Amino acid sequence: MARFDPFLPAGPRWYAVEARRPFLEDLAAGVLDWLGDHPPEALSDAVILLPNRRAARAFTAALSKHAGGRPLLLPQVRPLGDLEEDEPPFAPGELGLDLPPAIAPLTRRFEMARMIVEDFRPGLSPLRALEMADALGGFLDSCQLEEIGDLHRIATLVEGDLAEHWRESAEFLALAVEAWPKRLEAMGLVDPAWRRARLLRLLATAWTERPPTQTVIAAGSTGTAPAAADVLAAVAAAPRGCVVLPGLDRELDPAVWATLGDNEQHPQNALWRLLHGRAEREAVRPWFRPAEDPVEQARGRARQRLINEALRPADATDDWRTVISALRADAFRGQSADPIAQGLEGLSVVTVRAEEDAAATLALMMRETLETPNPDGTGKTCALVTPDIALGRRVAARLERWGVVADVSSGQPLSRMAAGRLVDLAVRFVDKPLDPHALL
């Protein structure tokens, strides 16, 4: 019999994996523990919804790893942000309509730039037109994902006493958001964000009215888009459904948790908005956790608690001394070690003068990690998490010099790929066919 059954409690079923734990690894371990001694095909009817295709591939690999050679028929793993109406979790004919195809991102960018030059800014340089197209596209994507339908009031949002360029920008947006849908309609296409939000809304409505009877697990999503949040709520309430949240802080002070709705910069804000009105934080259960070394568990919990306290909203930091004293008094369930010292163990602060020095330092640290095996002889892995794409690419370039190929999630610039360099040289040659520098 399986030791862990996520569908045993009455719905809605909300679970969470601690921030310090490897999310997809624990998710796969929990799914396989639930599978227990059932036949391998028992998993094939299940639908696993993950945030994106990258997570879907990583989860499939984690399942194979934890299966340990056991034969499995894999579940239907689908990216929540890239659903298609003719694929699971949609049943054939469930929607009763065919949505127009989405315009390709590159085509959209150039069509927007052409529209801006032809209809609004004649004589605008191509580079500036593309920049305005990017800004317009990002604005429309945000509105469509948030399902904001009334965009006609944009021009009235800027007060008369503000700068002229603010008013001009608002007027341009007001005209562009009316002209662009007409241009798309003439092409028989729709925006990708609108199509994605529409599919999620249709799925949420269908599963709310007719809950799925098959096994459905939605994991890793924070439901930042309203339609996605409603899909998660429908999955949690389904007879064989559950939602697994990433990194929910279940130990944060209730008084602080209650204030997160007004603090959009806090890391837990998205989870607060998802759970608000749908489930109480106290009702979220811990997901399956594999066996863990007690020392590593205590160190990990100490670090997680310390970081969570460091991220308290500014309005709730007046009692930090009390919090630190409470952490030490609690000593994390009887552990004798100082939890503050435990939480800081292994953390380093490096101060550098320039970005190149930062890239060199990070690359060296990652190389050292990869070349230092675990006590049992197995290899280590490491990851660099940074919002600075340029820094990530600098680190990847330095690692490449040592024969280490980093998997950069942001992708590679076209100019750094062989095909991109070929196109660049061809364009330069066409522009200046007799230029010796272009030929060389």
Predicted regions and their residues:
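Nucleic acid-machinery interaction/catalytic patches
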Residues: 1-440
